[in-house]
């Protein structure tokens, strides 16, 4: 089953599900009052916001093979916490699909982007 990390990854998740012939399901209840976690000023704030932001629906993950689709991965810390949380629900497998190009360099135009060392894609060989 394909599950989007709400909200901006939904179109890609539906397209991937259609291409694979796999159902695309809503796997999370999202708190609409939380902001984008990757631009928050420090890791403690990002962690607290993520705990409030996404609540997984147990029945969607328990015993299922899941392809988790997200729009981007910046530091990797948000995805790490999501996967850690989902593992407590005993899925058969968790796979990831990130549909944007790798973020390898900081952006200095007003968004709190980390240094190159903090960007997960800058540390990976392709």
Residue map of PLM features:
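PRPP-associated nucleotide enzymes
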Residues: 1-126
């Amino acid at each position: 089953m394909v599950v989007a990390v709400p909200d901006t990854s939904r179109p890609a998740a539906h397209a991937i599900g259609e291409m694979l012939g796999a159902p695309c399901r809503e796997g999370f209840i999202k708190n609409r009052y939380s902001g984008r976690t990757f631009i928050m000023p420090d890791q403690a704030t990002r962690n607290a916001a993520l705990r409030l932001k996404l609540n997984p629906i147990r029945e969607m993950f328990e015993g299922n093979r899941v392809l988790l689709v997200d729009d981007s991965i910046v530091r990797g810390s948000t995805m790490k916490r999501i996967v850690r949380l989902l593992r407590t629900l005993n899925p058969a497998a968790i796979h990831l699909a990130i549909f944007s190009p790798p973020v390898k360099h900081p952006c200095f135009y007003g968004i709190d982007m980390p240094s190159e060392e903090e960007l997960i894609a800058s540390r990976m060989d392709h």
